Amino acid sequence: MPGTVLLLAASPVGKGCLVDAASVLPVLAAVPPAVLAGTDTANVVELADPLEPQAVLTRLRAAAAAPGPLTVFVTGQLQLDRKQRLPHLALARTTPSTVRYTGFPWHWFREELRLRSAGTTTLLLDLHVDAATWAWLRGRGLECGPGVAVYGRVAPPVGRRKVAAPTYMKAVDDRVAERRAAGAGAVASAGAGPDRGRGRGGGPGAVGWRCGRRWWPRCGFRPRGPFPPCPRGPRHQPSGSS
């Protein structure tokens, strides 16, 4: 059965940018789709610096509804909206004062992926955060949905007016290249990505690990720290509801 791959790289334009997210897309897009998906054939959807959260939701919803394995690569930065203090993936037009309206609410990932069969969905995340979001994540968490295998890292701020590189995703590409050279196959089925802690994709202060049966069962994605239950966010509007 064909697989589906969603490549999403987003970061704000201007001084609010924390990571050069879009720079990783040419690297990942050069990998054969079947290798990214871990299937014989695959369809790839690429979103580079999208402007509208609804456009991202439409693509994510279509990918989640597709049969077969789904692999989602997300590179970018998280910010909290000022009213509800919930994490959003910052898009091209996101500013600190407009996060709630121009960012992509993280809980939409969870809501769109929650109905997929366990073991058919993989997320690879390379996320950067500001100081406020880092503190929020340490006390809560970043849920991605039940039955979703999560690999990646959350990196703290790199300093004022500095733009970080998506080193985790570049490490994923290196791992894929190694496996292709060894004839081992695909990223989605191989447990790709650096090991837990400050591995090849980490960096100073970065927190990254592999989620799944071998590492952290269905945990979502969290930095180190106490893990009280994550409060529920605003209700997500499912497809077809009014």
List PLM regions with ranges.
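A short, glycine/acidic-enriched catalytic loop
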Residues: 77-110
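Proline/glycine-rich low-complexity loops and linkers
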Residues: 112-135
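Extracytoplasmic/secreted cell-surface and envelope-processing proteins
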Residues: 17, 81-83, 132-136
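Boundary/activation segment at the start of structured domains
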Residues: 1-69, 228-231, 242
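Short beta-strand segments
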Residues: 8-9, 72-77, 124-126
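Active-site-proximal C-terminal subdomain of hydrolase catalytic domains
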Residues: 128-215
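Extended non-globular C-terminal regions
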Residues: 205-242
